[in-house]
């Protein structure tokens, strides 16, 4: 486990779901990963499998009542075409719905919009709003990924 700056702990190894596009395989893989002890599941809207990931999580939790949602760490990402302030807020809500979760632990900007950094900044503002609106309890942590120094 790694302790993040806000005190949230993140499991050091995640089960990634990139390229698992078949519903049955994705759902079963996520469930099996959790059965094997993974507690961090990594998803993204662009992978087109958040619904299947959510089903795997839901089935696992249903069959393992001693493990609660808060014992898991779920990551997903906002894609380039969903960047911008309002767009990111809508994309987040859509991911929550597809995953069938009450909250997401970590929401990332999958790739910065290097052709229009203003869009990336607006996206970041939306992530800050989601994070700072604690009464909603929708998001535990935000960060960037795939950022190169020149960005």
Residue ranges and their predicted role:
Residues 14-18, 42-44, 75-77, 107-110, ...:
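A cross-family glycoside hydrolase active-site/sugar-binding cleft signature
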Residues 11-24, 76-87, 116-118:
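Active-site mouth loops of central-metabolism enzymes
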Residues 1-72, 102, 122-126, 132:
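N-terminal binding-site loop/beta-alpha segment at the start of enzyme catalytic domains
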Residues 83-151:
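Glycine/proline-rich, positively charged
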């Amino acid at each position: 486990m790694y302790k993040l700056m806000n005190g949230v702990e993140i499991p050091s190894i995640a089960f990634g779901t990139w390229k698992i596009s078949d519903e049955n395989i994705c759902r079963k893989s996520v469930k099996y990963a959790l059965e094997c002890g993974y507690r961090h599941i990594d998803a993204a809207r662009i992978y087109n499998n958040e619904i299947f990931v959510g089903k795997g999580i839901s089935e696992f939790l249903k069959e393992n009542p001693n493990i609660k949602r808060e014992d898991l760490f779920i990551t997903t990402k906002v894609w380039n075409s969903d960047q911008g302030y309002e767009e990111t807020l809508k994309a987040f809500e859509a991911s929550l719905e597809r995953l069938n979760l009450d909250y997401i632990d970590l929401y990332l900007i999958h790739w910065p919009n290097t052709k229009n950094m203003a869009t990336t900044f607006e996206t970041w503002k939306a992530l800050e709003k989601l994070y700072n609106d604690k009464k909603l309890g929708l998001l535990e942590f935000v960060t960037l990924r795939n950022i190169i120094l020149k960005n």
